Amino acid sequence: MEGLSLLQLPRDKFRKSSFFVWVIILFQKAFSMPLGVVTNSTLEVTEIDQLVCKDHLASTDQLKSVGLNLEGSGVSTDIPSATKRWGFRSGVPPQVVSYEAGEWAENCYNLEIKKPDGSECLPPPPDGVRGFPRCRYVHKAQGTGPCPGDYAFHKDGAFFLYDRLASTVIYRGVNFAEGVIAFLILAKPKETFLQSPPIREAANYTENTSSYYATSYLEYEIENFGAQHSTTLFKINNNTFVLLDRPHTPQFLFQLNDTIQLHQQLSNTTGKLIWTLDANINADIGEWAFWENKKNLSEQLRGEELSFETLSLNETEDDDATSSRTTKGRISDRATRKYSDLVPKDSPGMVSLHVPEGETTLPSQNSTEGRRVDVNTQETITETTATIIGTNGNNMQISTIGTGLSSSQILSSSPTMAPSPETQTSTTYTPKLPVMTTEEPTTPPRNSPGSTTEAPTLTTPENITTAVKTVWAQESTSNGLITSTVTGILGSLGLRKRSRRQVNTRATGKCNPNLHYWTAQEQHNAAGIAWIPYFGPGAEGIYTEGLMHNQNALVCGLRQLANETTQALQLFLRATTELRTYTILNRKAIDFLLRRWGGTCRILGPDCCIEPHDWTKNITDKINQIIHDFIDNPLPNQDNDDNWWTGWRQWIPAGIGITGIIIAIIALLCVCKLLC
């Protein structure tokens, strides 16, 4: 008893020691420091690459649903190309699937389409459906179309991604992105006494939809939406549009808008002014590398090298001609040349308008920069065309040649003008801008390569619109209703891939790994250890580096798996379709034979000569390729390129826990020694 009594502490001292130990334990429990990718449970950084095709599913808690955008596979994102991937169907109810995390989208869409009778084509969004929360550009399209169906589906079987909800149909007036849903198998969580519970995100909810990134809006007007031949117009203002007939980038539309605004090539009447693009103009400029990094523009849309030429004027039979007038023009790209021969030598401060019936010289007027030259004569000039042939900010030269317009319809802006009594053979109007010199313009475009990702000043939802005629001559048809990426996958394999995408060749050459998830989990994880002096900032950097590195490899691996699986499914679909056709023919043949009508082939003719193809070997080869890529040759392990820092830092989580336990034991012994 005496030996046992030596090991016992007084009651008051025991209480103090126990309280001190419990404080340490609770402190460790409350301030857990996750280092690595944290999802449903804390994962070590090195475990991420081994989750694909390496782990088995023990419970549904190990599944994490992720929305992957189709633009990551290289599909065309402009409105004309995107609308060709959507179609209407009836008799198929919509389906909605929730997902936990997604990628930031560079291009989102917002549709409001009406039928010819004025009724709505698209259904309103159900309760709980919110717009996609991370959009760099939102393409807002309005217009009319036949809408031959109840709902707008994706022809390739992809989903329309909303905020944490993916639907098979398009809802009216809600931002959405195209994508597919993938499921990740997470490692089974390890329950320990000192581990804090994982932070749960609110289901289908995003608190901050802006995420400190500017969202720019482009507006369009579409005619005959959903039909084989449609017209899409990019809207500059309510009466000025640009007809788009080729793939383009949002940056091109922004620069085109600024150029038209700067040159004052806007409709000065209540009628429409529709500009078309010359074939020599490159509309695929200024490609972005997703959100974080803006690539230098490989080519600038130089306004001083563009020519604006009015082509024709169409009027309806209505009494109010001004409200029904449609003026068409062409924006062309001209080679750099000298225009000294077009500048009047005796009047260097004038803009020359050459008119076949006469010429009158007017004195120059003082005006502000950026205003138009307005011709207000009442007589009709046969064959007149206004063409801006040069400008560098303050200098502009305009000449007119014949197309059958009245002088009041020319896009110029001089409120008053009087003809000179000296001659009746020529007319020269005074502009509010001096004549362009023969020197090369030095004013850079407004969107310089070094500009930031903020939206341009003219890109608000009110003054940016997008309207376009988009009928592609070489448009590819869909390959079937397959619930996967399909066309995007074909593009990622090289058939339709856009070469200007930045690709991390270290991870893979078949997809774009420059992606980032917009989960609320990351902010909590990164901030969980920032309070520690000296150690906090470094640990946050470790977390971010590990997250970005492993996420890229994981997403690329998923895309490769989807690519090869989809091709096999396409072949299987084709084989099934042909087998069904062959079965129907046999049924018809039996029917005809029973009626003794002379045999199947005699009655069916060429339709009898259908032979179903055997695609078994092709499907088997694709499956073997998947096994070879993801089982025999798994994704690269991060240990292959570990250096001294990435090697010893893996001991940090364990070291922190061991150090805390040692400190607690030492403190307990010290307290016991002092109290004893």
Curated annotation (Swiss-Prot):
Provide the residue span(s) of the region labelled Receptor-binding: 54-201
Where in the chain is the site Cleavage?
A: R501, Q502, N637, Q638
| Membrane topology, Cytoplasmic segments | 672-676
Processing after translation: The signal peptide region modulates GP's high mannose glycosylation, thereby determining the efficiency of the interactions with DC-SIGN(R).
Q: Which residues are glycosylated?
A: N40, N204, N208, N238, N257, N268, N296, N314, N366, N463, N563, N618
* One Pfam family here: Filo_glycop
User: Per the record, GO CC terms?
Assistant: extracellular region; host cell plasma membrane; membrane; viral envelope; virion membrane
Annotated region described as Fusion peptide, given as residue ranges: 524-539
Q: Where is the lipid attached (S-palmitoyl cysteine)?
A: C670, C672
Which controlled-vocabulary keywords does the entry list? Clathrin-mediated endocytosis of virus by host, Cleavage on pair of basic residues, Coiled coil, Disulfide bond, Fusion of virus membrane with host endosomal membrane, Fusion of virus membrane with host membrane, Glycoprotein, Host cell membrane, Host membrane, Host-virus interaction, Inhibition of host innate immune response by virus, Inhibition of host tetherin by virus, Lipoprotein, Membrane, Palmitate, Secreted, Signal, Transmembrane, Transmembrane helix, Viral attachment to host cell, Viral attachment to host entry receptor, Viral envelope protein, Viral immunoevasion, Viral penetration into host cytoplasm, Virion, Virus endocytosis by host, Virus entry into host cell
Q: Give positions of region: Mucin-like region.
A: 305-485
User: What name has this protein been given in UniProt?
Assistant: Envelope glycoprotein
Taxonomic classification: Viruses, Riboviria, Orthornavirae, Negarnaviricota, Haploviricotina
The encoding gene is GP
